[in-house]
Amino acid sequence: MQTDCSVEGFDFGTVEGRAVEAGFDAGLVTSDAGGLLLGATDRAIGMMGRFAACFHDERRPELIEHEVATLVGQRVFGIALGYEDLNDHDELRHDPLMAVLAGKLEARREDCAPIAGKSTLNRLELSKLASTRYHKISHNPMAIRALLVDLFVEAHVRAPKQIILDLDATDDPMHGEQEGRFFHGYYDCYCYLPLYVFCGRHRRSALDAADGAVEEMARIIAQIRRRWPRVRILLRADSGFARDDLMAWCEANGVDFLFGLGRNERLVAEIAAELDLAAAKSRRTGRPERRFKSFMWMTRRSWSRRRRVVAKAEWTQGEANPRFVVTSLRRDECKAKYLYEKVYCARGEMENRIKECQLDLYADRTSAATMRANQLRLWFYSMAYILLCALRRIGLHDTDFAQATCGTIRLKLLKIGALVRVSVRRIKFAMASACPAARDWGRAAVRLAIAALARASPA
């Protein structure tokens, strides 16, 4: 073991007669060497350059130290590595791994670090939709939204026969006086109400969950069909989206839907016989029992036509638990029991993805004063999520991390300590020899390199 002495440090007792000390004085060392996989993932999917192209920079080139592409990459890679707070970058701008990922090793001016600190990144997040005197970097929301759909389409090797788009709205609690802040009775807090499809879109919480869904679906589906003209599309969502305008749009545009339906007395009366049968059998067996029924239905005022409803008549814990869904799928295409249990209930997986975005990628960190800035933050978080998902999909299939959450991937594969050796010709990251995930890390690195080569040299 190498013996070192330090003037300043922390004392942690002794082990076998040797004093244990620690200090932040090792120089070129990084705790995020595994993040090299993120750079390899970006080369495999070509995301960061296209995301940076969604920004317009009107700063004077001769005065610029940090270009937009560097700033965007630094922010997204930082979030993916677990640094959601811009304050972290005042130290990370000296980190060799972050410099490698951002693609900038040396500063042009002596008084600058190679990459940006918190103030410069904050100005990026506060960028306007158009350049102003004090904000020279602007972003194009439509281009960013289009890129998100492009990345989804490109994640498929070939056009699928059918895709299912899950919609959901969730609360993003507010703890300040942000623009668009309203109290939401269901969530019992002041919040935003972002609409998630495969990315998030911020809305004021005063809106209905389904508000804006028609416009978003029209845009997304049109873009998907330009690439996959024959794909069948099913929209799946809870009862908050069972609105006549959305269902009518789906019917007019050849899009299938499967939405939860809020129960009422008329619907429950429709399945009274099935509930009685389920209750009788439950009393005999002592177990929950359920029956299913499919029927045509129309509301008294809000719907413009009759639609197929599938009901689950369930008796559990001594009481009725009826549930309903409305769908455009015909009976000959999908039987009632399979439709509810296998198709509709599978939407619960989206709840896990939303939790992953908010807990592992910090998508609820929306403390900027304006909705515009908070929306841009949400897009940064979304890009970091896409990057980690691509790492999982391309590099980690058939490994122990194939189904791991983004947080687990970060902890086990990205948070690896390394000594950094810099020479004229190379930068060597000497990672910890005792890394438990070294084998899977190596597999991912090889797979991502192959994918990047295939992207650079398409057949």
Where do the model's predicted regions map?
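Acidic/histidine-rich, metal-coordinating catalytic segments
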Residues: D168, R232-A242
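Dynamic "connector" segments at or just before major functional cores
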Residues: M1-C189, L193-A209, M217-A222, R226-R227, ...
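An anionic, glycine-rich sequence signature occurring as long contiguous blocks
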Residues: D4-G23, D256-L359, A445-A459
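Acidic, His- and aromatic-enriched active-site or binding-groove loops in soluble protein domains
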Residues: Y186-C191, A218, A252-L267
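Short amphipathic alpha-helical "interface-anchor" segments enriched in bulky aromatics
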Residues: T41, L339-L376, F380-R392
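Short, glycine/acidic-rich hinge or "gate" loops at secondary-structure transitions
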Residues: D90-L92, L105-A107, I233, L396-T405
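Conserved nucleotidyltransferase catalytic core and NTase-mimicking acidic/glycine-rich helix/loop elements
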Residues: G35, L388-A390, I394-L411, K415
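Structural motif
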Residues: P61-T70, A368-L378, A404
